[in-house]
Amino acid sequence: MKKILFIFIILLFNCHNTQNTGEMKIQQIPLEKQITYMIDITTNIPVIVYVNDIKASELNMPLGTAIDLNPYVLKNGKCKIKLQIFPLFRRGDTLVTVENIMRCNLFFGSYIRNKETDEILNYKADVALPIVAPKVDVPYFEQEWDVELTELPYELEGWSKGQDLRKWDKKELEKKVVAYYQKLWHILNNGEGGRWTKLTQKRINETAIFYYESEEENQEAIKNNQQNIEKYCTNNMIPLEDYEMKLYAEGKLVCLERKTHTKEFNNKSPLDIKGWSPLIRKGKKSGAGYYNVLLYLPQGSNEFVIIRK
């Protein structure tokens, strides 16, 4: 069985948070209904996957893994999957080969995770998403599929009531987004885990629902995340730089991402941080960790809300 890619584990320092403001009562759902939808991927080169026009993976995603869909969907219904393949930067490639494209295998499916035993139950990935490969090598490859979700036991508001940010003046929007990131940078660099928790409260609440967390799991994650921010981020954030603004979810979500490829970073090689959030803290000896935030602007409001990673 392939390794399940739990985003909240891979990005532990970036995970959900809640404390004493805006908490909600977590409704417990029976184990047999705790469905997590996913895309099972086998590939020999890095790829990027989008779910409902939201980037769900990075180029450094482990090969041969699975991507959870729950963070990127709000309710049952049609879900759009998009695959992108670029030439391999670290190898100096300029084309994506037909062979590499054809060796990408994607399957849609679901599973249930028993958190008490850490067992993966009812794992099935039996709906193939067939690749239509070109006849010659190409500078870039992209393909989309639609899948249907029918068994989610919840419905979330998420970014559904957000403004269409495509209608904003791009320069004005970017100025506003950068100002918000600067505020987040200072919070992280000061090690203010409590303030981070308050700003990510809505994300925390919805994460608890789509990952079927118990009250205890939720509070433990919040506590650990605050401690990690205090321990690892204080006076350890790199400058906020080399970024570009990205819109997702058909203009409902916005973020900043690093725009330049790297072959190494902070004494770790290879490490390509293109596409990362620019909210980056250096590792103690090498490498780095980053703090993803996807923002939306509620209708009738002028204040961003952090809703996903």
Report each predicted region and the residues it spans.
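Beta-strand-rich recognition domains
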Residues: 19-47, 84-190, 194, 199-214, ...
